[in-house]
Amino acid sequence: MDLLADSFFSALLLVASFDPEIVSIVAVSLKVSGTSTVIASLMGIPLGFFIAFESFAGKRMVITCLNTLLALPTVVIGLFVYAFISRRGILGPLDLLYTQKAMIIGQTILILPIVATFTIAAISRIDERYRKTAITLGANRRQTAFVILREARFGIVAAVIAAFGRVIAEVGISMMLGGNARGFTRTMTTAMALEYDKGQFALAVALGIILLGLSFTINLMFHFFQGKTRI
């Protein structure tokens, strides 16, 4: 009990003093996770919109595959990407392994299905009358798509927030592809695992407090925008 209390008190001091080590770790986490979220959004939103808006053969199968990928373990993604970017892999000459770029690639693969699936759900919830009204008023296909996209904007924002919340807390991909290098590829989750192994509970708890605060904020934002879709 004393260990927990002492660690918690020391952790609060570290957070309040903006410890350089913590600032560096949080900065790496936000940079890598933020970049992967932007890339996944640029790919996943158009993909999800196309799947929801268009009618084509195999549409149900594509949606099923995306839903299946939502449960894909991070270690599987890490292993898959590692096989491509390791020295013996196809992309070995690019020297991507144990870099932030490798982490971004893995994290993008992780959350791309999340963005696409949530976008599909957001588009599918839009009343069909919006499409029919737009067509009746003489809107072309592009203008109709814009109307649907505008009405689904809150659901799409919720998709991006959910993706960021998923990726900021992952550890498997960051550990396998980043290598947990101090000041370069060490994220909050990998640092917590390392500090726990070293017995440095204060830093681990401090990072846990920050991560918990981020998760709480992300969840509040997610439910806010998700609620907007019901208005």
Region locations from a protein language model:
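Transmembrane-helix boundary motif in ABC transporter permease subunits
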Residues: T35-L66, E128, R141, I148, ...
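C-terminal transmembrane helix and the adjacent membrane-cytosol boundary/short C-terminal tail
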Residues: T117-Y130, I135, R142, F146-V147, ...
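Transmembrane alpha-helices
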Residues: F118-T119, D127, R141-M176, F222
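Hydrophobic alpha-helical transmembrane segments of multipass integral membrane proteins
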Residues: K31-M43, L47, P73, A145, ...
